Amino acid sequence: MPSFTRLATAAVHLGLLAQSAFAKPYHREDPKLGAVASESSVCSEIGIDVLKKGGNAADALVATQFCIGVIGMYHSGIGGGGFMLVRSCEGKYEFIDFRETAPAAAFQDMYNNNTALSLYGGLASGVPGELRGLERLHKNYGSLPWKELVMPAVKVARYGFKVTEDLVHYMETTTPSNKFLTDDPTWAIDFAPHGYLVKLGETITRKRYADTLETIANDGPDAFYTGPIAEATIAALTKQNGTMTLEDLKNYTVAIRKPSEITYRGYKLTGTSAPSGGIVTLSTLNIVNGYEDFGDPAAINLTTHRLDEAMRFAYGQRSELGDPLFVEGLDAYQASILSNKTAAEVRSKISDFRTLNVSAYDPEGFESLPTPGTSHIVAADKSGLAISVTTTINLLFGSQLMVPETGVIMNDEMNDFSIPNSSNAFGYIPSPANYIRPGKRPLSSISPVIAESPDGKLYLVIGSAGGSRIITATIQNIHHVIDQDMTVPEALAQPRLHDQLSPNQVSFEYAYDNSTVAFMASLGHNVTWVAPGQSTAQGLRLLPNGTFEAGGEPRQHNSGGFAI
């Protein structure tokens, strides 16, 4: 009998999500040691192996994250950054912001004449923070040696891994009009070693990246921020007109911020604060917390409308958010957003009979920032230590700049800033609170959440990838688990809706109930249908009997949630 639980790893095809398309679990009868879930079953297994060897959830998370940077390089890697929420075994929370920062030479109008420069090439990258984030987690919470946690990813990169359905999908999504994976020699070494793009089932290696990770395994994260690796990074960026310097890399530090929290149906929900999207997630849930029978199947149509309206108001609140170091009064504003008074005021504005004009949601300078190149991981252990983390290089394959000597894929996070007098590449209105400043961190939709049961014990660790859809996916998954008493795999398999206020429409995955969508249309919502897979979540739960369950995103072919 296998020694771990595997849940929710089956592929989802268009329109089939309503059949709860997750794999039948196979498991040990008593998985009480811990759990890991990520977008790669290979990487989740590495995390589980760490738990087997006596490591804790922090160790498992670090090992899993390094592996994701190898296999899920289109989403994540040490050339990017992210946000991490940690619950200690004593029940204390820490929000580690390792988001990329604008280089010292960055300025507000740097992309006014060519917004494409914020997407591709040397000017598109913020200073990477992933390694400093993992370093902080390991130093404060880890138990096994750093090298022991990095080396599994080194082996995967050096000796290769199978080209999966997910990798094929993301390569095909990226390359129809841009053949950089095959035409750029720096990329082709890995992605087209035989003159053609690697195919499903073939083995792909990333040997330069393996060497880089091995150096970091031996010498620690400083090896990335100073010395030959740093020099190669800056040289590659400079060659493509970048202005990042060795000083920018050397001076990067994580920001430790105050987490945000609400009480929802008696459960304590802890999330992240600005510049992440955690406030929007918790604000939505705080608004609907005032509705009775929110999980009643008989009221599903009205519940869907109310949830969507709460999302729209919360996205309107988002327009004033940014980096707290650069936006005056943000702490007080965030506190007011999550107050019960504000939630009640919003509920009083929500009509059960119609949706409202966009202006009613107060979207001053509203901007939404899709970030498709994101990856989420959750990990927890029997002590109650739990981590929910989302990492990103922004767009798929980041800035499409790989450092030739190191194999590091650089982010294009600078596009997440607002550009004055110009909508960003996705057509959204600029938000002054999110204008570029040297050292500033751009606004994000990333929203990791950890829930405690009414008795104060760890209950749910959840989060999502998928740009602006991160927020709405996380909201719905929490709603399914807490209001509708679903397991994590069941919750992840439910069809999702998404409404970010701008554009003024609500999208439904193909499997969503037709009668509910018709009801929404009858209230004036602009409804549209989308294929599943635009948001990808991972989650785990600690049950009252002390056993864990975990779920990988069923919209991804190769995700994996495991418990041991």
Question: Which ranges hold each PLM region?
Answer:
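Internal maturation/activation junctions in enzymes
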Residues: G195, G290-I393, E405-T406, E413, ...
